[in-house]
Curated annotation (Swiss-Prot):
UniProt name for this protein: UPF0162 protein HI_1558
Pfam families hit by this protein: TPR_9 (PF13371), Transglut_core2 (PF13369)
Family: Belongs to the UPF0162 family.
Length: 267
């Protein structure tokens, strides 16, 4: 079965077309990447060793073309919007990673995603060797650095399990992207965008408790308290041990307070 690396970029295209009303088309967003593929093919010979081709691709993308992550504002939702990323050469690590995977597949280069717990990592496989690349800036990451990141997330002494550095399960990668996109929109209170995106995701996954939870959070921000209450109660009932459940229970108390205010207004 083919490991379809362009699919993560497809998720970005779908995301932007759902949330945006700026007239961008799927053909335009794919054409932008097609232009980069043509430029890369002019610069990278398929006759070179794979290591050299990978090195040159990273130099082109992060060096010559100037794609980067800005440490001051990389977390803003706009860094997931493809037109913004192409215009400003700036995005989140996952955005830039998706673009590198697209280029790698077009050039037949063995670069794959890793669902590392702390962030997306790129995995280059050449012969029997594996190297890891940070999509933030295209630099190589040592095993020691990966271990430091892991301990930073899970505590001193926590050890990376070998399977955590394998090629990503694509369905998990897509779910992780969808959650990141929802979180960014909700955090910035882009409520209409978030609601439309979640509604679209639920066309094929209507009972997903995380989509229902996030719809509830959006509805709460929009002031639709009874509907929000219903969604958040559903989530707590179905995912009581989820790490976010305690926060959601607090939200439920606040929502009930807001509903009671509306039911018994002060005179």
């Amino acid at each position: 079965m083919k490991y379809y690396r362009r699919a993560l970029y497809d998720k970005f295209v779908h995301f932007y077309l759902v949330i945006s009303d700026d007239g961008s088309s799927e053909a335009q967003l794919r054409g932008k990447m097609g232009g980069l593929v043509r430029k890369a093919r002019k610069k990278i010979s398929p006759d070179w060793p794979k290591e050299e081709q990978i090195h040159q691709l990273l130099q082109l993308f992060y060096g010559d073309w100037g794609f980067h992550c800005d440490p001051e504002d990389y977390f803003y939702a706009r860094n997931l919007y493809l037109p913004y990323v192409f215009e400003h050469r700036q995005g989140m690590p996952v955005t830039l990673g998706a673009m590198v995977f697209y280029l790698a597949e077009a050039l037949d280069l063995p670069i794959y995603p890793v669902n590392f717990p702390t962030q997306l990592i790129l995995r280059a496989e050449v012969r029997d060797e594996v190297a890891f690349i940070d999509p933030w800036d295209g630099t190589y990451i040592s095993q020691e650095k990966l271990q430091q990141l892991y301990e930073g997330a899970f505590g001193f002494g926590a050890k990376i399990q070998p399977e955590e550095l394998d090629r990503a399960d694509l369905s998990l990668l897509y779910s992780r992207f969808e959650q990141l996109a929802k979180n960014a929109l909700i955090r910035e209170e882009h409520n209409d965008m978030a609601y439309h995106y979640i509604k679209n995701l639920m066309i094929t996954d209507a009972e997903n408790p995380y989509h229902i939870r996030d719809r509830g959070l959006v509805l709460a921000q929009m002031g639709a308290y009874p509907s929000a209450l219903k969604d958040l109660e559903f989530f707590v009932e179905h995912c009581p041990k989820d790490p976010t459940a305690a926060f959601i229970r607090t939200q439920l108390l606040e929502l009930k307070g807001e509903i009671n205010k509306d039911t018994f207004p002060l005179h």
